[in-house]
Amino acid sequence: MALNGADVDDFTWEPPTEAETKVLQARRERQDRISRLMGDYLLRGYRMLGDTCADCGTILLQDKQRKIYCVACQELDSDVDKDNPALNAQAALSQAREHQLASSTEPASSSRPPSQPPVPRPEHCEGAAAGLKAAQAPPLPAAPPNTDAVASTQTALLQKLTWASVELGSSTSLETSIQLCGLIRACAEALGSLKQLDH
């Protein structure tokens, strides 16, 4: 039976390839970061506008001085993002080529697909891959911590933590309170890390 002149076999669903899954996951993570940042800015008094960024399509924000602000362009996009295949148009073309190659060389009815020669990656991917390989290198063994430095750092952190707690108790500004809470959390995390160094 044909639908609009097409075979029913043309409509079989195939799960996304590993590359497509990575692209979708990276886009989802990027959208989550944008949403979190936008929420933070809205709490600081920014207004959400009915317009979107001409470059990336993200909803624009406006501060109290009426300056237009795009969270994605001004905070997330960096040189690292340009090399990220999930966010780069060139990587999308590579993905389309991979899909075409996979569909044009469908395996025969045998249980093992024929081996395919490796497809060379574009140069812009090589730098990102090298960065990943370097990041996965095993860490060097840590030198024993200098107890004087650890103790003086703990003292400074405890003083800063005490000061921030007192300031938070007397703060009437939401923005200041948010910043003080962030400082308290950072001090607590740093103290925890220093305690791990001591043990």
Curated annotation (Swiss-Prot):
rRNA-binding recorded as keyword: no
Tissue: Expressed in the early postnatal brain.
Localization, UniProt: Cytoplasm
Motif Nuclear export signal per record, residues: 173-194
Residue numbers carrying Phosphoserine: 94
Any single Pfam family the record assigns to this protein: Auto_anti-p27
Cofactor: Zn(2+)
GO molecular function, one term: identical protein binding
Keywords: Acetylation, Cytoplasm, Metal-binding, Phosphoprotein, Zinc
Residue positions where N-acetylalanine is found in the record: 2
Biased composition (Low complexity): 127-137
Region (Disordered): 93-148
Positions contributing to Zn(2+) binding: 53, 56, 70, 73
Comment on bound cofactor: Binds 1 zinc ion per subunit.
Function: Might play a role in mitosis. Could be a centromere-associated protein. Antigenic molecule. May induce anti-centromere antibodies.
Subunit structure: Homodimer.
Name of the protein in question: Protein ZNRD2
Organism listed in the record: Mus musculus (Mouse)
